[in-house]
């Protein structure tokens, strides 16, 4: 049975840490589902982790619908949250239209959007329409061109106070959970203590109710990128390169495929098929 937002919120009540991972396709989603990940994020991070872009900004609603649908087909138990991509929730009407596609066509159970108090009317309207919404504060990747680069947010007293107020406003608007990205650990703890809804941290210290990571980071699939806030639980890049190199070599020396990898037909049938052919 698929997890619900109530299940996720009850994990906070019980003090049970919430593990969340990104997923972008059915195969990976099925693996993570079988491993017991309770919540999967179809992130617009697919832009710089799958599609080859340098940021999340170029990701479209069509991209998100397609990848969300793939994840929904692969995962049978995890709650699936889909990112609303850049400028798809600039107005109430746009937000409702984008959320409808992600849920009806993509099969998501919830959507995630970035921003603080300015997003309150959007969150409230989506919740009124029956759309569970996850908020996102701190560093917001869709605003990369404003930030210049990924950097910790909320270090000053004024910025920290503003983030606390944003978090409370999003909760009051109906958000069921809140991502805190690149936030000082003490501030993330203070926000977590003040909210009834779960906080999900990424680069926000150990005191959030849960953690989310980009799966390519924790599995070591990219040699060129190792953010401080992640831990590599595996180093798959060299294993994959070695396996693929072995495949290329086996094909090159004709040691693969062999008879055990092949099928055969009756010789009489083959002779009949070839009869009269040059």
From Swiss-Prot:
Reaction catalysed by this enzyme: 3-methyl-2-oxobutanoate + (6R)-5,10-methylene-5,6,7,8-tetrahydrofolate + H2O = 2-dehydropantoate + (6S)-5,6,7,8-tetrahydrofolate
GO MF annotation terms: 3-methyl-2-oxobutanoate hydroxymethyltransferase activity; magnesium ion binding
Location within or outside the cell: Cytoplasm
Annotated InterPro entries: Pantoate_hydroxy_MeTrfase, Pyrv/PenolPyrv_kinase-like_dom, Pyrv_kinase-like_dom_sf
Protein role: Catalyzes the reversible reaction in which hydroxymethyl group from 5,10-methylenetetrahydrofolate is transferred onto alpha-ketoisovalerate to form ketopantoate.
The protein's assembly and partners: Homodecamer; pentamer of dimers.
Protein name: 3-methyl-2-oxobutanoate hydroxymethyltransferase
Name of the encoding gene: panB
């Amino acid at each position: 049975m698929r997890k619900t937002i109530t299940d996720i919120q009850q994990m906070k009540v019980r003090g049970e840490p919430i593990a969340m991972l990104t997923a972008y396709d059915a195969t990976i989603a099925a693996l993570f589902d079988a491993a017991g990940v309770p919540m999967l994020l179809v992130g617009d991070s697919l832009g710089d982790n799958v599609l080859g872009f340098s940021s999340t900004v170029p990701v479209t609603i069509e991209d998100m619908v397609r990848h969300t649908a793939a994840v929904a087909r692969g995962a049978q138990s995890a709650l699936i949250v889909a990112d609303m991509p850049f400028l798809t929730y600039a107005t109430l009407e746009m937000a409702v239209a984008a959320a409808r596609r992600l849920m009806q066509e993509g099969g998501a159970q919830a959507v995630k959007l970035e921003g603080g108090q300015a997003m309150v009317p959007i969150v409230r309207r989506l919740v009124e329409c029956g759309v569970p919404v996850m908020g996102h504060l701190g560093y917001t990747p869709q605003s990369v061109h404003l930030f210049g680069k990924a950097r910790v947010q909320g270090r000053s007293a004024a910025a920290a106070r503003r983030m606390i107020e944003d978090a409370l406003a999003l909760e009051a608007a109906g958000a069921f959970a809140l991502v805190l990205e690149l936030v000082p650990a003490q501030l993330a703890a203070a926000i977590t203590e003040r909210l009834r809804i779960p906080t999900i941290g990424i680069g926000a210290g150990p005191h959030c109710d849960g953690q989310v990571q980009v799966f390519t980071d924790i599995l070591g699939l990219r040699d060129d990128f190792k953010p401080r806030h992640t831990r590599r639980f595996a180093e798959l890049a060299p294993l994959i390169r070695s396996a693929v190199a072995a495949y290329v070599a086996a094909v090159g020396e004709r040691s693969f495929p062999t008879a055990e990898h092949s099928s055969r037909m009756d010789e009489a049938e083959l002779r009949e098929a070839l009869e009269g052919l040059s």
